Amino acid sequence: MKRILVVLILLVFLMFTGCSDNKRIDKAEVVKFITAQTEKNENKYTFYLLTGEQKPVSVQALDLAEAKKLVKKDYLPELSLSRLEMIIYEEKFDENLMLDDVNHLKKSYSVSPLTKILLANKKTLGEIEEDEKKVDEYDEALIRYKKDNKDSDTELLSVYNKNYEDDKLSLVFPYITEKGQIVSKNIEIASKKLENKQKN
């Protein structure tokens, strides 16, 4: 009889703890990917959720750190980047700001260093807004691209490990063309030291 009672207590305990965990998971508004582009001289960040049940949320912000705060405050109080798969930047997005965003994510332990980075043009970003499933196609193309371009900076971790040479940071990002092909795009980012030298 005592054994049966213990088993019943355990079952009740597991049932209630399991339910609370499920509620917590459902409550979290998990982001699958983010796009960043420039519109009317302002930076626009759009957060696409993993479930796809909610519409993407767009905000105007100085950088990703501010964008996250605005989204949490006004739209998604339980915002989570723990399952973030990709960040897609407009090709004309400010390179220094892009690097600031990456460094911001580096400080967040919940964001995987294997999160992918992709560059795109306005047209491609517009297609994503119309059909976010396009990103799954780009993800598959990125896997094939990475096999043939191992030196490309396809993930956050690769950017974390890069060092400045001659006060410049040289990066090779994957770029998705209008035809859906991925090619390499070279980017050089001047360090703050070099910028100060040029001003003087």
Please place each PLM-identified region on the residue numbering.
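Membrane-proximal alpha-helical signals and transmembrane carboxylates
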Residues: 4-10, 16-200
